[in-house]
């Protein structure tokens, strides 16, 4: 734990705050990614490829394309680190990228969609973590 704290990227956490509107949009993105995680567990690469074909967000489409080609979590991290487009980003886009990467790692590991959603909403703060519970409860009621 201490080693993880010592090597943490503190510049990311000291950046300017992200607007409520951006966080709301990111919450919707996290919910969409949770649905992709459910498809990935059911249909494997076919579900991921279908999601990649219909995705508009560049950060997510890039990762879904890699997952559809069989990339693992380590390959995803390396691809995002090497891609020059994802280097110098504003705080909102940096938060989006971090959240998407964490969600894609969950999808690559075939984790349960609830776990993936929880991991992603943890980046947005406690109120969104609680909002995720309400979203999941609503989805269960609709089944």
Task: Show where each model-derived region lies.
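Large intracellular
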Residues: 1-143
């Amino acid at each position: 734990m201490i080693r993880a704290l010592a090597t943490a990227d503190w510049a990311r956490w000291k950046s300017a705050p992200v607007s409520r509107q951006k966080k709301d949009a990111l919450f919707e993105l996290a919910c969409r990614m949770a649905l992709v995680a459910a498809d990935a567990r059911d249909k494997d690469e076919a579900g991921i490829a279908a999601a990649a074909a219909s995705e508009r967000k560049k950060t997510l489409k890039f990762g879904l394309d890699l997952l559809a080609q069989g990339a693992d979590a380590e390959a995803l991290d390396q691809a995002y680190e090497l891609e020059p487009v994802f280097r110098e980003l504003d705080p909102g886009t940096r938060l989006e990228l971090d959240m998407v990467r964490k969600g894609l790692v969950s999808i690559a590991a075939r984790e349960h969609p609830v776990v993936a959603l929880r991991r992603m909403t943890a980046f947005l703060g406690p109120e969104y973590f609680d909002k995720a519970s309400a979203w999941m409860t609503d989805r269960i009621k609709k089944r």
